[in-house]
A protein has these predicted regions:
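PAPS/PAP-binding and catalytic site of the sulfotransferase fold
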Residues: 12-26, 174-201, 211
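Compositionally biased, low-structure terminal segments
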Residues: 85, 189, 195, 202, ...
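Short, solvent-exposed polar/charged micro-motifs at secondary-structure junctions
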Residues: 93-95, 184-187, 219
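Short acidic/His-enriched helical or mixed secondary-structure segments at domain edges of catalytic enzymes
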Residues: 210-234
Length: 273
């Protein structure tokens, strides 16, 4: 069965993957980005090989919805719990759901202040913040579809957030990036408690502290500078690691646009009073 780490892009998904892969799979005392391959992106080409025509899925990205079920069924043939990353909203397209309780045993849903998301996403994609805001509010936004990944039906930040929040057919937890930033140990332990029965491991404070130390932002940023990072696109992936970076980068007009469009959800999450 699949356990998802689900989020809108640039919300802390990779940081959580780093923490979890270090805790679960580290064999020495040094973090390596290769560990992240233990928690892969679901839309990697290899999970759809021999199921679909990959060239067709590259040219007609929304057709991937026809193969979500088959790809997840094949993954689950291994008969073990497996963690996957996704930026897909948990929605249906032409009556094809991204995932169901047949394939999924749970999810870790990570959210981040959308004002910070657009700043980080613009730098990561080497585009303007205006373009990132447009994408953030686009209900039909399609992400990824790169060299090694197929398309992800990311949708707007609002749809992405609500789609996982409202999914009641399998258990999940919500982790706010800002809480993970402020109290990494507490939020990481919350995540491990959620996972421990599914993955059959014991909590180990020494390993928790080691994972937090090896995966703090400065360490990950230094690793990226020294060795590079395969998920780096245009700009630096681990850029600032701040909680409220939007206060330094976002114009008043764009700030107001986001807050007006997402007022209810941002208030619900404590991003607006």
């Amino acid at each position: 069965m699949i356990i998802w780490i689900a989020s809108y892009p640039k919300s802390g998904n990779t940081w959580m993957r780093a923490l979890l892969s270090t805790y679960l799979y580290l064999e020495n005392d040094k973090f390596d980005f290769k560990l992240l391959s233990k928690i892969p992106n679901f839309t990697r080409d290899k999970y759809f090989e021999n199921i679909a025509d990959l060239n067709l899925l590259k040219s007609e990205p929304l057709k991937i919805s026809e193969y979500w079920n088959a790809a997840q069924s094949r993954i689950n043939l291994q008969g073990e719990e497996k963690i996957f990353k996704t930026h897909s909203a948990c929605v249906s397209l032409k009556d094809k759901w991204f995932t169901t309780e047949t394939h999924t045993s749970g999810y870790i849903h990570i959210v981040r202040d959308p004002r910070s998301v657009v700043c980080s996403l613009a730098a990561h994609s080497n585009t303007t913040i205006e373009k990132s805001v447009k994408d953030l509010l686009n209900d039909n936004f399609i992400g990824s579809n790169g060299k090694y990944n197929l398309a992800e039906l990311t949708c707007s930040w609002k749809i992405n957030y609500l789609s996982w929040k409202k999914k009641k057919k399998f258990p999940g937890i919500l982790i706010k990036y800002e809480d993970l930033f402020d109290n990494t140990e507490k939020e990481f332990k919350k995540t491990l408690v959620f996972l421990q029965d599914k993955l059959n491991f014991e909590l180990n404070d020494k390993k928790i502290n080691q994972a937090i130390k090896l995966c703090n932002f400065s360490e990950l940023s230094n690793q990226e500078d020294k060795r590079g990072f395969v998920e780096q696109v245009n700009g630096k992936f681990f850029r600032k690691g701040k909680k409220d970076s939007w206060k330094e980068e976002l114009s008043t007009n764009l700030k107001n646009q986001i807050e007006k469009s997402l007022k209810k959800e941002m208030q619900e999450l404590g991003y607006l009073n």
